[in-house]
């Protein structure tokens, strides 16, 4: 498989497949490690699109590795430092090179750690309805894309494949994982966001919001896992396109979301259930270009 061939699904025979997520295929490596292969699949509204985004898996992996290295002083991460190619057969290396991470097997927390620095997406919709986001009361008079007085932590429960993640108040997170761990996750997630957002702003990118995932290692240490600060887990806006009161142009999959919002299936708006309508070639190409530009801008 050449580097330019899109990978919709990995097919490794040398390792047992544990799960196919919306984007990543996870394989067991012994009892204590996982091989995470980032495919070129794209999901929006928790539905996986039928068309791969060429180069996406490699770009996601490069960006995640970039951030893991930059944020390692705040919290440990799941990387082992071992080469993904070392655990597959020679014939399978082309499926993993550049798009995989060999990571520690952790006990994942059942709550996603979402941090918002700006009002956007579901947060903006909820604010219009009741002046708050996930139980966090916000000042009146904010607009779509307004910068918040300070970043807010708005957890969500993890959805099963095909279901929608559900925003929950912090109090519910405390009930699920306990107060000490919930408070640690909130503190660490906000620190990660603030550090990354300040760096990205210096590169001309606003990180409006992002989602972190954490797990516990065998010693019970909180560990950053999965992906981090990629266009799949974050809303990235170029500073030159930013203004309050609009949906700023973005480097993430918002471009696909916007197209899907106006997509018609059988004469009706798409109901955000699988299967998704086929993405036009120009939407695929422009999305691939957005991912590429975000990485180039951040790492320049």
Swiss-Prot record:
It catalyses: 5-amino-1-(5-phospho-D-ribosyl)imidazole-4-carboxylate + L-aspartate + ATP = (2S)-2-[5-amino-1-(5-phospho-beta-D-ribosyl)imidazole-4-carboxamido]succinate + ADP + phosphate + 2 H(+). InterPro entries: SAICAR_synt/ADE2_N, SAICAR_synth, SAICAR_synthetase_CS. One of its GO terms (cellular component) is cytoplasm. GO terms for molecular function: ATP binding; phosphoribosylaminoimidazolesuccinocarboxamide synthase activity. Pathway: Purine metabolism; IMP biosynthesis via de novo pathway; 5-amino-1-(5-phospho-D-ribosyl)imidazole-4-carboxamide from 5-amino-1-(5-phospho-D-ribosyl)imidazole-4-carboxylate: step 1/2. Keywords: ATP-binding, Ligase, Nucleotide-binding, Purine biosynthesis. GO terms for biological process: 'de novo' IMP biosynthetic process. It holds the Pfam family SAICAR_synt. Signal peptide: none annotated. Its EC number is 6.3.2.6. HAMAP family: SAICAR_synth (MF_00137). Belongs to the SAICAR synthetase family. This is Phosphoribosylaminoimidazole-succinocarboxamide synthase.
């Amino acid at each position: 498989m050449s580097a330019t061939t899109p990978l919709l699904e990995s097919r490794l025979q040398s390792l047992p497949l544990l799960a196919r997520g919306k984007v990543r295929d996870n394989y067991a490596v012994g009892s204590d490690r996982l091989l995470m292969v980032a495919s070129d699949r794209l999901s929006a509204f928790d539905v996986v699109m039928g068309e791969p985004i060429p180069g996406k898996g490699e770009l996601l992996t490069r960006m995640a590795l970039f951030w893991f290295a930059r944020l390692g002083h705040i919290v440990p991460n799941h990387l082992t430092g071992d080469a993904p190619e070392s655990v597959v057969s020679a014939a399978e290396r082309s499926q993993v090179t550049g798009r995989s991470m060999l990571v520690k097997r952790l006990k994942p927390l059942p709550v996603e750690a979402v941090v918002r620095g700006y009002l956007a997406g579901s947060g903006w919709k909820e604010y219009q309805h009741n002046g708050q986001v996930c139980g966090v009361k916000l000042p009146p008079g904010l607009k779509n894309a307004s910068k918040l007085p300070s970043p807010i932590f708005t957890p969500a429960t993890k959805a099963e494949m095909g279901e929608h993640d559900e925003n929950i108040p912090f109090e519910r997170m405390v009930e699920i994982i306990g107060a000490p761990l919930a408070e640690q996750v909130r503190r660490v997630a906000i620190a990660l966001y603030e550090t990354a957002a300040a760096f990205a702003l210096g590169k001309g990118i606003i990180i409006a919001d992002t989602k972190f995932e954490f797990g516990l290692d065998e010693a019970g240490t909180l560990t950053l896992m999965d992906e981090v600060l990629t266009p799949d887990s974050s809303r990235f806006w170029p500073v030159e396109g930013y203004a309050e009161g609009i949906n700023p142009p973005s480097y993430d999959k918002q471009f696909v979301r916007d197209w899907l919002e106006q997509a018609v299936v059988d004469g009706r708006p798409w109901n955000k259930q699988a299967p998704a309508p086929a993405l036009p070639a120009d939407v695929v190409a422009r999305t691939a270009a957005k991912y590429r530009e975000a990485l180039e801008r951040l790492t320049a």
